[in-house]
Amino acid sequence: MQYSRMTATRENPKYKNLRVEECDVLIIGSGPVGATYAREILDPGSGASPGRKAPKVIMVETGAQESKVPGEHKKNAVVYQKHIDSFVNVIQGSLFATSVPTRVDPNLKLPPVSWSPREKQNFNGQNKEQNIYHNLDANGVSRNVGGMSTHWTCATPRQHELERSKIFDDATWDRLYKRAEELIGTRTDVLDQSIRQRLVLDILRKKFKNRDAKALPLAAEKVEGKNLIKWSSSSTVLGNLLEDEKFTLLDQHHCEKLEFNDETNKVSFAIIKNLAKPQTSKEDEDRLRIKAKYVIVCGGPILTPQLLFKSGFRYDEEDAEDSEGNKSSLYIPALGRNLTEQTMCFCQIVLKDKWVEELQKNNWGPECEEHRRKYDEEDDPLRIPFDDLDPQVTLPFTENTPWHTQIHRDAFSYGAVPPAIDKRTIVDLRYFGRAETQWRNRVTFSKKLTDAYGMPQPTFDFKLSTKDRLESHRMMQDMEKVAGELGGYLPGSEPQFLAPGLALHVCGTTAALRKGCRSEDEMKRISVCDENSKVWGVENLHLGGLNVIPGPRSNASNPTLTAMCFAIKGAEEIRRKLGKKGSHSGNRDDGDVDTDTDDDA
């Protein structure tokens, strides 16, 4: 195939007079994946060479810094750990709907003299291009320092071998997972002293002997001497980089687009708008150009392909041709495609009498005994500490039960407990199911409509396969079986499927593929970047996020840890290249890339 230069997206002369800031690496997005890139480039676990000049890294984030420590988990505030259901409002306030179909039902009570639309229009952030039956209704994005890590559940399981791709061999996956777990602080002993954790584990191990019930891996640690938990987030990954003079974090700085050099096939500048800066009569004084040796886009599975589209990348063939019929080198058909999202079912139960009796009578240790001395049965019939930590348990993904389970108590944007019920008797069950990787499932971007930040409006086109629907039914049956052993349903929280997109685990929209396994044209047709997350055809542009995680397998578990693995791999590549220029040099395993091309993703 004949490719033309990047003439459609060459440097725009209108930006020529903008102030220029230079750095070695520009990271767009401040979630845990962007934080992983920053940490591994500036302070790698291995491979930093003494005497080398440390690279300069700038991180930009559209949203504001909303905590004293940049990117800290908001649930670390004691008030939310004392009143977990109040954290629901924090989650809801941190999520912004991605695509809302235009409502066509009229307001019949509107006074006749008042204006009203007579057809579909775009207002209040609605999207008239969205088919309501193909939408991920509950999908949302977070725009704040730390991204979704400021309110996530901190579940960090490794993908089962039936979920993860073979883009890396098993030894490399293990190495990357270990480093990711170290960065985010994954542990399985956080709740070892929780009474209800031990009770729920004991019940599940007795009733489901072949299911290997275990503590859910959590990116968290218990606060010494108190029944509080310190939840991990981007701030955990960044660590002391937040005080490093070589690292700069700019909040409320929005990357509007990338400018390319049509001679070198590189990103030459990123156009950044300071959203909070007052603007006087001088045009564009709130904008600057950042010139970086390497640019990393970590905006998440929707906002990353959105920025690429705004910058000139195209997925439709007719939009990518010049006047002579040559394809732009920014033509990547897979952009936005292969989108996967998990099905999700949910219920809440009130523990059975016999399990509550065990809570009341069993010897759970000195903390419980102290509580019983302080409060008699009339003061507290449950007889366990009021601040006993909530359980976090899982029945792991297997070939016969191919779904991820979280049997716990936590705050979501749904599932609050009525005040008349003792919250210590409530257990939530959340099941996450796979969806097959399908080329037809995608997110597209409008040429006409924009979001609140002037970026192309995303539109979903997503449908479950027949296999997905049947498997989700089996998943629901399994959840009902497990719930029935634990207790009876909390009224209003009976088993139910949740709105599409609520899992917030969209993957694959800029999927990776091992380079060299196919022809260049074929690789660009079915993927967006290589195993180091470098975009095809652009020498200095890397990606990060759930969007990089490829099929053909699909995941049911929380994919954050896996996305961090790709970021570690990409950072190793960038660090190695910077090392040649006198910054950092890194170690690379010769066996990192599996040369077997039968399963290259």
Swiss-Prot record:
Region called Disordered, residue ranges: 577-601
Cofactor remark from the record: Binds 1 FAD covalently per subunit.
Catalytic activity, EC: 1.1.3.10
Enzyme class: oxidoreductase
Pfam families: GMC_oxred_C, GMC_oxred_N
Catalytic activity: D-glucose + O2 = 2-dehydro-D-glucose + H2O2
SUPFAM superfamilies: FAD-linked reductases, C-terminal domain, FAD/NAD(P)-binding domain
Positions contributing to substrate binding: 406, 408
Active site, renumbered: 505, 558
Modified residues (Tele-8alpha-FAD histidine): 151
Record-level Gene Ontology MF annotations: flavin adenine dinucleotide binding; pyranose oxidase activity
Residue runs in coiled coils: none
One annotated GO biological process: secondary metabolite biosynthetic process
UniProtKB keywords: FAD, Flavoprotein, Oxidoreductase
Function: Catalyzes the oxidation of various aldopyranoses and disaccharides on carbon-2 to the corresponding 2-keto sugars concomitant with the reduction of O(2) to H(2)O(2).
Oligomer and partners: Homotetramer.
Protein name (Swiss-Prot/TrEMBL): Pyranose 2-oxidase
